[in-house]
Curated annotation (Swiss-Prot):
Annotated compartments: Cytoplasm; Nucleus; Cytoplasm, Perinuclear region; Synapse, Synaptosome
Name of the protein this chain belongs to: Cytoplasmic FMR1-interacting protein 2
Organism whose genome encodes this protein: Pongo abelii (Sumatran orangutan)
Entry keyword annotation includes Nucleus: yes
Keyword flag Nucleus: yes
Classification via Pfam families: CYRIA-B_Rac1-bd, FragX_IP
Positions of post-translational N6-acetyllysine modification: K1037
Gene name per UniProt: CYFIP2
Amino acid sequence: MTTHVTLEDALSNVDLLEELPLPDQQPCIEPPPSSIMYQANFDTNFEDRNAFVTGIARYIEQATVHSSMNEMLEEGHEYAVMLYTWRSCSRAIPQVKCNEQPNRVEIYEKTVEVLEPEVTKLMKFMYFQRKAIERFCSEVKRLCHAERRKDFVSEAYLLTLGKFINMFAVLDELKNMKCSVKNDHSAYKRAAQFLRKMADPQSIQESQNLSMFLANHNRITQCLHQQLEVIPGYEELLADIVNICVDYYENKMYLTPSEKHMLLKVMGFGLYLMDGNVSNIYKLDAKKRINLSKIDKFFKQLQVVPLFGDMQIELARYIETSAHYEENKSKWTCTQSSISPQYNICEQMVQIRDDHIRFISELARYSNSEVVTGSGLDSQKSDEEYRELFDLALRGLQLLSKWSAHVMEVYSWKLVHPTDKFCNKDCPGTAEEYERATRYNYTSEEKFAFVEVIAMIKGLQVLMGRMESVFNQAIRNTIYAALQDFAQVTLREPLRQAVRKKKNVLISVLQAIRKTICDWEGGREPPNDPCLRGEKDPKGGFDIKVPRRAVGPSSTQLYMVRTMLESLIADKSGSKKTLRSSLDGPIVLAIEDFHKQSFFFTHLLNISEALQQCCDLSQLWFREFFLELTMGRRIQFPIEMSMPWILTDHILETKEPSMMEYVLYPLDLYNDSAYYALTKFKKQFLYDEIEAEVNLCFDQFVYKLADQIFAYYKAMAGSVLLDKRFRAECKNYGVIIPYPPSNRYETLLKQRHVQLLGRSIDLNRLITQRISAAMYKSLDQAISRFESEDLTSIVELEWLLEINRLTHRLLCKHMTLDSFDAMFREANHNVSAPYGRITLHVFWELNFDFLPNYCYNGSTNRFVRTAIPFTQEPQRDKPANIQPYYLYGSKPLNIAYSHIYSSYRNFVGPPHFKTICRLLGYQGIAVVMEELLKIVESLLQGTILQYVKTLIEVMPKICRLPRHEYGSPGILEFFHHQLKDIIEYAELKTDVFQSLREVGNAILFCLLIEQALSQEEVCDLLHAAPFQNILPRVYIKEGERLEVRMKRLEAKYAPLHLVPLIERLGTPQQIAIAREGDLLTKERLCCGLSMFEVILTRIRSYLQDPIWRGPPPTNGVMHVDECVEFHRLWSAMQFVYCIPVGTNEFTAEQCFGDGLNWAGCSIIVLLGQQRRFDLFDFCYHLLKVQRQDGKDEIIKNVPLKKMADRIRKYQILNNEVFAILNKYMKSVETDSSTVEHVRCFQPPIHQSLATTC
């Protein structure tokens, strides 16, 4: 039956879909984010102690004492935070320079107003330390009373007293360290006295006491020592405290790093307090009351421990400052200067990695079954399975604590032992102390080890955090089962024996334990239990069903049970005989074992908080102690001295592939520090400083990482495209061009929501933004590099663009970039403009360098730079100095590609023209051609026209071709004489030839561009053929039909035929575009379009001036001997440059190349004077005669034979030029007119006949 759903319900259900988490398969390479849920803390600080009326009254009273002492410890921590985070106020307040200063009253009033709240805090601190010392000493006095010395004192109580000792040590060191506290109080006191704020004697006395308290070093320690020494037997209690710390430390009865370090500090400070005028620790050691050798071993293994924040303490200092140290110096090894292996983190890494792999493997096995398959919370497990998960959680926390402690211990040791310029050559002599302790105090291996350990800690924290709910279930089940089994089952036998033997005290304790903790099946203890009567169980046994629940005990409940159990096995008791002696050996062992195991119950019941504390590395950032040492010179240290950034930057600078995936873990230290600043220190200004540093560091991080990623993929593209034969040849000569080492940037590029200071950062997006900018800059620099060089560098430009194209393709696999064509158009300034920077520079180079300075060689089909430049070298902008990765990817690749493209530098030939075609495209080529035509037009109608007019004037009016009988020497002499004015014309071999060379080079450029364009179009057509159903004819065997094979081939390639596909699937607009593209591709070569024809036709239109063709012939047909047409002038010019030059002179071809001939021949062909030129050319006539008579003489310093040879060369060249030009011009002529115009002339009549007629 279908249910009716309203529209509102349906819409609300759709809205709920937004709340569903959508995993994006992002690789986890960062620590877990801080939970936005509350952490439940069930520690009541014994507020519910009165509820346990069934417990032993004495321990309930002790819980009351514990409660008040814990409150005092919390207050002491607040004062420690106050001292540690104290920043000098007096330095920020303007100082009164002299008593005559007019605004001194106002300054003093403001000083008092600002400092009074702070001084009040200091006053409260002084009163607190007095009260704390009095409270501690009163407890010691009570416990050391003659009648109480044999009383049982619980371990928890002794540890609380130990925490007090630790508190005193920390507060005293902080007070000693903070000079700014004393300075602020002095400033306040000075201002208050001036304003007479402290008029009454009590205020003056309090202020004096505070001054003395702050001024005297170790004041708290001295007061504590003095008050303890008047208490008889105080050393016995302190010995118990020290011994419990030794026992806990030796048996690793601690979980968090702070607990471990607290035990060591209590040992050291406890020994210092015990050793004095009244007591001697060495005598206590002799009596076996304490074990100094064991403590010495601990202190030697761990010489330095964190005291508070970045303050450290050398444990040996407690020993060295004790009263009887000098005479017992030889007993201590920890005071000798030696480095413990504990501080060599690199050597420890083998064991750390092994532990990590072993534990991760085991955790993964449970994680896969519990979390991945979803069977964790729903399935009911056995006690053994819960116990395994319980043990796994405990081992994980202990491992995390061990690694975190190790990191902090190495860091602490480094802070106490800063390097110097003698130990580290990189350390400058002017480096600050904090800089020497952090920036220069670690080797590269140590930094990598730090990063790896931090990554292990944070990575394991993530894995354990995912299983937190599973662990919580297992922990509560295991603790509940352990407590109930122990209380309801294990304690039955000792209770039975106690009842039988009538041990009333023992019975009361055992019953109190059971009543405190037992959760009976029926809600009450079975009244028929034989053990309650001291009887044996029946033969069938007495069945006790212990229930199973996921409920842990309260903190007070667990304390009561553990304390009462401890009282059973303690060596001390209020009576002469201990309760331990009343218990059997196995029971004692069972109680001891349970007591030891239950130590960690409190931590595990708060696994979330314990996990956070075991992974807390926040102190790696705090530096208040070292800031205090700068005496106001520093407000804050730069990021180069900050440990989190030092580690992050080291990974980025070294580009170590194995560490790249760890790069986000050091940044999480800022998360730890920020969390600690807000929740533990509760100081907003510290958080603000952390946030400011994070903003700077993360910008630097993204900047450096983006540059590295771009450089990596650029080098990869450059290596892929580098010619393999070139690489092999280099290898043969011993030059290795390396491929970029594989790096793990892909994982970083998948990070879409990096958590940092509560922000969710899309790292991929930020990197994409910077890489887009880098890609644009790379293209921009490639074009700028081309703009700073001549036309020959266009081949290099194309390869730079190809490398950038491949780089773009590689990067697009991991990020969303704009299309390469769009980026290229933007860099080329070709988005809205009709032509881009490349087109402009090509034309600029053609106009100012190529046309005037290059010589064409028809044999090699290349242009080379002229031997004698007639124009100045154009001024180009120098290329900017840029990073290697903006070119080919790296320095070796830049050198390699520079060597390859150096072979294209000294000429302009087919490779360059093909590149120009590909880069400029039809539109760019059209623009360049149009501009070249303008240049040709200005030359032909300007400079050249003026020279032609001038030269026609100096030509002989009539110059007949001499008869063969004159011989070649005579003909040479005749022409030399006739053309004397032309030969001696000063500007002919310079400006005239130069202008003609420019025209010729322009014509040649257009011709060669068309040839290159035709090749590119053929290539395009062949590539497009399979998609246009243009298939090659197939070879067929005898007997096979061509139609059948072709149809089969067409059917095979039918899916590739683009137009029918788009017609079937595309939109009308797409269909129209596909048809137009198909038509253009098929027809652009088939219709025989020729650009060069149009160029020549346009040039012909520039030759309209009458001077080119001369006046109409007098005979009505043609000019024969008259020198009035251009071809006669060109014959004269040809005669000039065919004259051989001297030994050290440059020939015309060296100076002007074939472009000179191309210009002349092109003008002749376009004027229709080619045949006349061939008939009436002076040089050709001389060559014919010389070939017949074969004479070789020197006529007017001109060697005849050499000149004839030169004429023959130019004749061949002219014929080639004419053939090429005619090939293009004839198609124009045949198109324009299919009828040949023939003019009919009357036959010639002899003169004699004409007269008679």
